[in-house]
A protein has these predicted regions:
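Juxtamembrane loop-to-helix connectors within ABC transporter transmembrane domains
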Residues: 11, 83-84, 103-147
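Transmembrane helix-loop-helix hairpins at lipid-water interfaces of multipass membrane proteins
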Residues: 18-75, 82, 155-160, 271-275
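A hydrophobic transmembrane-helix motif
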Residues: 36-40, 64, 68-71, 136-180, ...
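Conserved catalytic Walker-motif region of ABC-type ATPase nucleotide-binding domains
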Residues: 102, 224, 312, 338-340
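An intracellular "coupling" helix at the cytosolic face of ABC transporter transmembrane type-1 domains
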Residues: 104-108, 124-133, 137, 182-199, ...
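Cytosolic ends of transmembrane helices, especially the final helix of ABC transmembrane type-1 domains
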Residues: 212, 216, 240, 288-315
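ABC-type nucleotide-binding domain
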Residues: 331-544
Length: 544
């Protein structure tokens, strides 16, 4: 349970609520056991009574039993309201922590995993952890408290029968110890299979156009069937083990009841105890049946939580390579210099850049050309400091890029990526996304500069048109131009186009470049392109 120890700070943070919950557990179990003795007294009273009529002692015992049951219900409700609520709060905080960490992860970290796996850790794994934090902890403490109170009351009633009743405890402990390890291993295997299913479904939905273009629906259905069948088999295998665990515990408790009946019967015949005492012992033991029957479920919950916490910790333990060490405010002018910059992608070992050097002054423009795979996009990623160079250094305004305030610097960067990405929102919100307080007039202005306003006004809802997931409702050229408008509306100091005019015809491309030159003055512009015509208005050209 080493991984679950990382939850200790959360327990400490919510210690007051949890402590209150534990007090309610003690109170609830006290009244559960307290009322049992009155059943025994009522049984003994009935055994002594030989005629029908009102027996006030029996009525008194029944009323006390009912009152204790009401108090038990009240404290049980309060127990759940404190412990379960605290688990929900910790779940909320843990999800926020994971999501925040996802935001801080570098691109290199993202390439090590899949979106489906990331989503699974944020949803399914956190739910498994929350089940441990709430019901898991609550039932463990409840069982312990109930066992202590019940054992004390049983010892007070008859110590010999108590020892016989507790005799199976070592057997139960051995079963729990042996099976919990198996459940832990099977849980990890099942959760890995579940992540594989989530990843496959995410990839299929994201690439549904390609699937349909190539008429591969049945191929993907066949693959999905294999993956979901594998998950089903692993889940059923785990369920069988859990069911066997549950059955074993009930079997041991059944033997225990038979033992109480035999030993209690012998002692009653010998006149050592009353029939009410036997009734009390049956009630004491059967009070433990429900908590003990949950031991298998609790063990399963805890082992699943352990496996899930390990998976979550794998990501939380990742330290981003991109670290901000400067929090000052200052002006970014836009002078850029690459000094013998090399970059090797860590996941593949591919050398994208080797000893690249160039410089560009603030307000100048640079076109970068070269064959596919020569490292043009890598330069864009380095300039945005989404990755850091393997060798060499990048200077901005004469200072190493690593020494700049990362968040301030990125606020001065306008980046139009090679792959146009739009959020599932309106056109207005997608363009205005780049600034804090966008207004429609500003949005329209930059949509016109990006030469996309004429298309937007033809839509029924114009700027309020929903673009669909990843902009699926728009053409490739429309998505590119909306992304350009989104970058321009920031009025950035440094503007980077990463082959982001490729889906446009030459006339539209020319219109956009002319508009940018007219409307955006004294900005550093870097244009990555394959087209010779796109470089005509650039001050410099770098060929890789």
């Amino acid at each position: 349970m080493k991984a679950l120890k990382t939850l200790n700070p959360y327990f400490w943070k919510h210690r007051n609520l949890l402590f209150l919950g534990f007090l309610f557990i003690i109170a609830s179990n006290f009244f559960i056991i307290y009322k049992v003795q009155f059943i025994g007294q009522a049984v003994d009273e009935l055994a002594k009574t030989s005629k029908f009529g009102v027996n006030f002692k029996i009525i008194k015992n029944v009323l006390i039993f009912i009152g204790s049951s009401l108090l038990t219900g009240l404290f049980t409700f309060m127990m759940r309201q404190t412990i379960i609520v605290s688990s929900r709060k910790i779940e909320f905080e843990l999800k926020n922590k994971i999501y925040t960490h996802y935001q801080e992860m570098s691109l290199t970290d993202y390439k090590k995993t899949t979106i489906g796996d990331l989503m699974n850790r944020l949803s399914e794994d956190v739910v498994a952890i929350r089940m441990y934090l709430g019901p898991g902890v609550m039932y463990i403490v409840n069982l312990f408290v109930l066992l202590v109170i019940t054992s004390a009351k049983m010892l007070q009633t008859d110590w010999e029968m108590t020892l016989w009743s507790l005799l199976p405890a070592p057997i139960l402990s051995l079963i729990i110890y042996k099976v919990s390890g198996v459940i832990s291993k099977k849980s990890k295997i099942m959760q890995a299979s579940q992540s594989a299913v989530s990843t496959f479904v995410t990839d299929t939905i994201s690439g549904i156009r390609v699937v349909k273009f190539f008429a591969k629906e049945f191929y993907f259905l066949d693959n999905y069937d294999k993956k979901i069948s594998d998950y089903k088999d692993k889940a059923i295998n785990l369920a069988r083990i859990e069911a066997s665990f549950f059955t074993s515990i009930l079997f041991v408790i059944g033997i225990l009841n038979a033992g109480i009946l035999y030993i209690g019967g012998q002692k009653y015949i010998d006149g050592e105890i009353s029939i009410g005492t036997i009734a009390n012992f049956f009630l004491y033991v059967n009070t433990l049946i429900w908590p003990f029957s949950l031991v298998g479920w609790i063990t399963s919950v805890n082992q699943r939580a352990e496996a899930s916490m390990q998976r979550v910790n794998e990501f939380l333990d990742m330290k981003s390579e991109i670290i901000n060490t400067n929090f000052e405010n200052y002006e970014i002018k836009g002078d850029i210099e690459f000094r013998n910059v090399s970059y090797i992608y860590p996941n593949t070992g591919i050398k994208a850049l080797e000893n690249v050097s160039f410089s560009i002054k603030s307000g100048e423009s640079l076109a970068i050309m070269g064959k596919t795979g020569c490292g043009k996009t890598t330069i864009a990623l380095l300039l945005c400091r989404l990755i850091d160079p393997t060798e060499g250094e990048i200077l901005v305004d004469g200072k190493n890029l690593k020494e700049h305030n990362l968040y301030l610097y990125r606020q001065h960067i306008g980046y139009v990526p090679q792959e146009s990405y739009l959020f599932s929102d309106t056109i207005e919100n997608n363009i205005g996304f780049a600034i804090d307080t966008p207004n429609i007039d500003t949005i329209i202005k930059y949509a016109k500069i990006a030469d996309v306003d004429k298309n937007i006004i033809e839509f029924k809802d114009q700027y309020h048109t929903m673009v669909g997931e990843r902009g699926v409702m728009l053409s490739g050229g429309q998505k590119q131009r909306i992304c350009i408008a989104r970058a321009l509306i920031k009025q950035p100091t440094i503007l980077i186009f990463d082959d982001s005019l490729s889906a446009l015809d030459s006339q539209t491309e020319s219109n956009i470049i002319n508009n940018i030159n007219e409307e955006i003055k004294n900005k550093t512009i870097i244009l990555i392109t394959h087209r010779e015509s796109s470089t005509e208005r650039m001050d410099r050209i770098l060929k890789l």
